[in-house]
Amino acid sequence: MNNSNYKDIWINSYPVFFALVLEPAVSLVDSFVGSRLGLLQLSGIGVGESIYGALVWGFIFLAYGTTPLVSSLRSNRDYGSVIKLIAFGRKLVYFFGTLTFLVIFIYSDYLISLFQPVHEVAEHARTYIIPRTFGCIFYLYILHTAAVLRGLRKASATLASAVIAAVVNIIFDFIFVFVFNLGLFGIGLASTLAFFFSAIYLHIILKKEVSTFTRTENSSYIDIRKSFFSMSSAIFLRSIFLVGMMTLMKNFASRFSSEAIALNHILLYVWNIFVMLIDSVAVASQTLVAEKIVNSTYWKSNLSKSLIKICFFLSILVFLIVSIFLVDLVE
């Protein structure tokens, strides 16, 4: 087995892994801060997070559908089409970001009522989700821009942006809650500011990268919309299924008690952290796989065999860790 395959997978995977893990890890910090305010507040975060996630995470195709297309275009040195794809992706970000903001902002009371929480939890959920809703467009911008950079083999930018978001979020969490006494409003606002600064960083990095594209590079006509959505359709269905499953579980928990909502909220993030371990390999390998497919050398290649072995090993590892240490992780 060619060790260079494992090296390429590692180089592309570790920034993505730590970036993906940081998001649920920071959400656990949000939950910790919320738990200091009270169980009802923590339950409110759980309900608000479910609504936000159901409407925003469905657009993960903006990331997963972008990376392989950018990678294949880069392999063909078709940077003119890469620029067109960036512009098209940003239009989608602005549209879906604005739409999501309006839906949550206008219909937040109705969306919260679907979980049938007690009055206090419903109020806390609204207090949390309204300021966080302003960060929707920044979050989607991060998804798209980081995906473009991964396709350009700049995966380290994904990790750097995640670190920026995590640090800003945690710092503002404690400042807004424990210094300015903003409560759940402060936690939601901290998240929005974190996404804003992270989006600014990625915008600057991508702008510098695009400035290196020369006018002499190849540029061919391709239907950007058709190519993008052909890659994104299956990913969109996967996202809808996963988000729907998690939202349904949270909805069932909300019908039992505030304690059940809080426990479900924590368990889902523990699950997310470990699943991200495997997902990071899938996300990072999109670049490598796309490059191989362009040259018609992926199927039955050492790379494909390496990816199958790595994912199988990680699946077994996650299963054993969760089976043995789940109670300790939750406590």
Indicate where each model-derived feature is located:
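Signature of the first transmembrane helix
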Residues: K7-T67, S230-R255
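Short membrane-interface helical motifs at transmembrane helix boundaries
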Residues: L99-I130, L317-E331
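Alpha-helical transmembrane segments of multi-pass membrane proteins
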Residues: H119-I142, V270-F274
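Residue-level recognition of transmembrane alpha-helices
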Residues: S13, L20, G46-E49, V93, ...
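Small-residue-rich hydrophobic transmembrane alpha-helices
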Residues: L42-L102, Y139-R153, A157, I261-V322, ...
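Membrane-interface helix-loop junctions in multi-pass transport and translocation proteins
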Residues: S156, A166-A199, I324-D328
